Regions:
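HIT superfamily nucleotide-processing domains
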Residues: 1-172
Length: 172
C-alpha cells in the first residue's frame, strides 16, 4: 500500500490550538493583514493557508460556522464559488501557475484539518512542484514568504476587480 506523506504539515498537526473555530475566530479579529485574510465578501472570505501545500495556497470559507456542504445556504454557496473564480484569476495573473487544484475535505476522515467549518482549498501547481525534499529531508520548499505572497495577491485582486477591493478594507 502506498502512502501519501506531507511532513511539512506536521507543524499544523502538532501546533497548540486555541479554543473555538479557527475560521470564526480569525474572521472576527479584524486583523486581516496579520491573519492573511486576502478578501472579505458578504458571506465568505479568502485566507492564505499558513501551512501551504504550495505557494499561494488559498482557502475560501463562509463567515457562518457550518461544517456540511449540504447545510450551506444558497447565497453562501454562490458567493463561495464566485470568490473562488476570482481567486483563480488572481493566482493565474499573480503567480502564473501551470495548473490549479480546487477541493474540499468533508469530515475528519477525509483529511479535513478543520472539519467543523467547511472551506475550499485552492492550490496553485507547477510542473515539478513535487520533489524529493519532503521524503528525504522532511522539508517542503515554498519559494515565497507568506507576507510577500499576500502583498502580491492583494495587488492583483485590486487590479483585477475594483468592486471587490473597495469593499470592507482587508488592511485592518
Amino acid at each position: 500500500m502506498e502512502r501519501l506523506w506531507a511532513p511539512w504539515r506536521e507543524k499544523f498537526i502538532l501546533c497548540e490550538r486555541k479554543p473555538g473555530c479557527f475560521f470564526c475566530r480569525t474572521a472576527k479579529e479584524n486583523q486581516d493583514r496579520k491573519n492573511l485574510i486576502l478578501f472579505r465578501g458578504k458571506k465568505c472570505f479568502v485566507i492564505l493557508n499558513r501551512y501551504p501545500y504550495n505557494n499561494g495556497h488559498l482557502m475560501v470559507a463562509p463567515f457562518r460556522h457550518v461544517g456540511k456542504l449540504e447545510e450551506l445556504k444558497e447565497e453562501e454557496l454562490t458567493e463561495l464559488w464566485k470568490i473562488s473564480q476570482l481567486c483563480v484569476k488572481i493566482l493565474k495573473s499573480g503567480l502564473k501557475p501551470q495548473g490549479i487544484n480546487l477541493g474540499m475535505n468533508l469530515g475528519k476522515v477525509s483529511g479535513a484539518g478543520v472539519a467543523d467549518h467547511i472551506h475550499l482549498h485552492i492550490v496553485p501547481r507547477w510542473q515539478g512542484d513535487t520533489n524529493f525534499m519532503p521524503i528525504l529531508a522532511e522539508t517542503k520548499i515554498v519559494s515565497v514568504g507568506l507576507s510577500n505572497t499576500y502583498r502580491l495577491l492583494k495587488k492583483e485582486l485590486q487590479r483585477i476587480d475594483k468592486r471587490h477591493s473597495k469593499r470592507r478594507s482587508a488592511d485592518r
